[in-house]
Amino acid sequence: LRERGLAIAAKRSDRETSNGCVLVKKVNDFAAIIALKCETDFVANGADFIKLTSDILDAAIAAKAHTLDEVKALKVGESDAQAAVTQRSGITGEKMELDGYCVLEGDNIEVYDHMNKHTLCTMVQLNENNEEAGHKVAMQVAAMRPVALDESSVSEETKKTELEVAVAKTKEELVE
């Protein structure tokens, strides 16, 4: 049965994974966010899929993993995380992949899971301890989808494109 599941997963390797589960969690001074992708929202919203994502995130936080490769190698259940994902892929018949992982360490970290839907999560770290402000900033990050923290981290191409959009919008408003 396991070999059959691996064969199914291999056949689906060229398919697009446009849905999935994103989870974020903070334990003491360590926070992590992880994304496990799949093909359909039906699978993404399933309890087993969300539990697998949660189990992988729990293992990553317990090990204080810093990279996605470290996470993939962590023991989750009776196998490593990557094998657990492949096994779940064989069960559902959908392509699945661990797609993203990021951590923050230190004080003043706030995490946010938008409407507890497990599709849009953020984590932020402030210079000062202010839970309410941190929560509001994390919500704004989710709502506004910023491209950078400050101007120095924005590419020149993005600046040029944004300027062109702003100029075009201003011209349209002047014509009205």
Give the positions of each predicted feature:
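N-terminal assembly/interaction segments in proteins that build large macromolecular machines
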Residues: 1-176
